[in-house]
């Protein structure tokens, strides 16, 4: 017979009252990063031949034709900066500068660069949670890890804006035969897609942390406008400009959604999976055509294409918000970082 014995366990150590807030702040930073990754296309200005940029977590990334710079506001109020040379794809491979093709290539490069910028800003924000000996050290994400994150982001985009609308439109067609025609089916599919996009943009704008990202987005636009107007880059000068810019990624995404409706009508395929495969196959083509439209509209404000990009400009009322002077200062610093590298690239003066 086994004798009974009392099992004594040591009392657990009391949890410090500081641990819970630190864990929550760290989790909040990770959630901000994940949300910003999904917003990447809406925050970018993916024009290869002009100055553009992207809002990041508590900062701004700016790019010139041959360089990019990023400035992030640290928790202590100072600004952390970083800059690197940037290779223009169309100079190395001339075919990448062809119309439509250049849009796909430039947007792909913008996604990779945008993700790197977001990682940098997230590292700066998370620096306060690291051990003292590791603070200030930046770890570059490996190529495969970055590829996995970008694949996840693209997969999320395809699932939310391609798969879900197609499922919903198919169910409506089965329930109501009036939606069975080629035109009506794709209109319904497009309306659902745009509705999901608007709901996602509006929903994220309710989160105060992402709203600050939208303020930095506004600071980026104002700074680009001031630069293009050859105005001295000071906070008072920059603040005089608009937060709505025609080359914004928000306008690009809305243009993509509108063009999708018209393009899908031209391909009367049958069967759910055939339609889904068609949407995936046409995505690069539609992105390239939309890029050319945004590019043309930015140069010809009174054209029909400019009119088609108006919905995206209206949507910038959500994705860009009025920045304060400290946020504008970040955007100016980022652009100055990029332009300093631009001037000395390869030891020659590129832009005076």
Regions found by a protein language model. Give the residues of each.
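Polar-ligand-bearing catalytic/cofactor-coordination segments
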Residues: 26, 31, 40-52, 56, ...
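Alpha-helical transmembrane segments of polytopic integral membrane proteins
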Residues: 114, 121, 161-165, 169, ...
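Structural motif marking the loop-to-transmembrane transition
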Residues: 100, 104, 140, 144, ...
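Membrane-interface elements of multi-pass transporters and channels
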Residues: 122, 126, 167-179, 206-207, ...
């Amino acid at each position: 017979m086994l004798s009974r014995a009392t099992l004594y366990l040591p009392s657990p150590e009391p949890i410090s009252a500081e641990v819970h807030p630190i864990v929550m702040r760290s989790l909040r930073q990770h959630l901000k990063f994940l949300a910003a990754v999904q917003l990447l296309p809406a925050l970018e200005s993916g024009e290869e031949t002009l100055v553009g940029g992207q809002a990041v977590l508590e900062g701004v990334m700016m790019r010139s034709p041959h360089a990019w710079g990023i400035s992030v506001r640290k928790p202590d109020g100072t600004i952390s900066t970083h800059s690197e040379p940037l290779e223009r794809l169309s100079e190395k491979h001339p075919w990448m500068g062809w119309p439509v093709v250049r849009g796909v290539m430039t947007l792909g490069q913008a996604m990779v660069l945008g993700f790197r910028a977001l990682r940098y800003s997230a590292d700066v924000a998370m620096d306060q949670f690291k051990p003292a000996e590791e603070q200030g050290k930046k770890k570059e994400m490996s190529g495969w890890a970055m590829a996995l994150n970008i694949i996840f982001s693209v997969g999320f985009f395809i699932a939310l804006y391609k798969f879900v609308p197609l499922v919903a439109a198919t169910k409506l067609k089965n329930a109501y035969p009036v939606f069975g025609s080629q035109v009506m089916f794709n209109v319904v599919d497009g309306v659902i897609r745009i509705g999901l996009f608007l709901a996602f943009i509006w929903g994220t704008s309710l989160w105060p942390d992402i709203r600050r990202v939208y303020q930095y987005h506004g600071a980026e636009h104002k700074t680009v406008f001031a630069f293009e107007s050859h105005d001295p880059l000071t906070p008072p000068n920059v603040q005089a400009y608009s937060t709505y810019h025609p080359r914004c990624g928000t306008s690009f995404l809305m243009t993509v959604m509108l063009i999708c409706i018209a393009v899908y009508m031209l391909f009367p395929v049958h069967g759910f999976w055939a339609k889904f495969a068609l949407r995936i196959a046409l995505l690069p083509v539609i992105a390239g055509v939309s890029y050319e439209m945004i590019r043309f509209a930015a140069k010809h404000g009174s054209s029909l294409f400019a009119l088609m990009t108006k919905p995206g400009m209206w949507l910038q009322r959500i994705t860009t918000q009025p920045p304060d002077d400290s946020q504008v200062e970040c955007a100016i610093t980022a652009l100055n970082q990029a332009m300093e590298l631009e001037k000395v690239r390869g030891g020659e003066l590129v832009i005076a």
